[in-house]
Amino acid sequence: MGISRDNWHKRRKTGGKRKPYHKKRKYELGRPAANTKIGPRRIHTVGVRGGNKKYRALRLDVGNFSWGSECCTRKTRIIDVVYNASNNELVRTKTLVKNCIVLIDSTPYRQWYESHYALPLGRKKGAKLTPEEEEILNKKRSKKIQKKYDERKKNAKISSLLEEQFQQGKLLACIASRPGQCGRADGYVLEGKELEFYLRKIKARKGK
C-alpha cells in the first residue's frame, strides 16, 4: 500500500466506517521522509506535481546561518544535532529537520567580527595570536580609518552567553529551511531569550 494523505480511510466522527467510493488518487500521495543526516552532501531530485522539482537532502554537512543582531550571514559546518522539540528520536539519530537545534562551527563569525570591529572574540586570556590575526587586530591604521573602527567599537558588545559559545568554538543555531524539500539546511544563530530558553531545555534533557 502506498503512503496516502487522504482522510476517507478514517472512521466518521460518530464511529461508523466509511466506504471508499474512489481509488487512491495521485494528488493524495505521500512520500517517505527524507531523514536528512549529517555527512558529505547527497541530494536526490524528486519530480513533483506541476512539473516542479523538489530536492531531497539525504545528507548535509554545511549550511548558511545568519547572525541576526550583527547582520552577518556565513556558510558554516554543521557539527551536531542537540535538541528537537518534536521528537528525541530525531536527536539520537542526528536527523536534520526544520526547527531543530544544531551546533555549528563559530570560526567564520569570529573572523568576521574580528575584522569588522578589530576586537578579539572568544579568545582565552593571554592566548598567542598567529601573524595574520595579529595583523588584523593590532594593525597600524590612519587616523580616519581608526576613527571609523572606534565608532564601530561603541556597538561591539555581545552577550556573555554568546561569548562563552565562541570560546568553545561552537554556536547553537536553529534550522529554518526544510532540508527534505529544498535540499538545504539554512537557519539562524540563537540569541537572547530564545538562546536562554533552549539552553535550559538542553540542560534539562541532559539531567534526565
Curated annotation (Swiss-Prot):
GO biological process entries: translation
Start and end residues of each stretch annotated as Disordered: 1-27
Compositionally biased tracts (Basic residues): 8-26
A Pfam family: Ribosomal_S8e
Compartment list: Cytoplasm; Membrane; Nucleus, Nucleolus
Keywords: Acetylation, Cytoplasm, Isopeptide bond, Lipoprotein, Membrane, Myristate, Nucleus, Phosphoprotein, Ribonucleoprotein, Ribosomal protein, Ubl conjugation
Phosphoserine carried by residues: S160
Gene3D superfamilies, A to Z: 3.10.290.70, Ribosomal protein S8e, subdomain
Membrane topology: Lipid-anchor
GO cellular component: cytosolic ribosome; membrane; nucleolus; ribonucleoprotein complex
Residues with the N6-acetyllysine modification: K37, K128
Family recorded in the similarity comment: Belongs to the eukaryotic ribosomal protein eS8 family.
Subunit (UniProt): Component of the small ribosomal subunit. Identified in a IGF2BP1-dependent mRNP granule complex containing untranslated mRNAs. Part of the small subunit (SSU) processome, composed of more than 70 proteins and the RNA chaperone small nucleolar RNA (snoRNA) U3.
NCBIfam families according to UniProt: eS8 (TIGR00307)
Official protein name in the record: Small ribosomal subunit protein eS8
Organism per entry: Oryctolagus cuniculus
Lineage: Eukaryota, Metazoa, Chordata, Craniata, Vertebrata
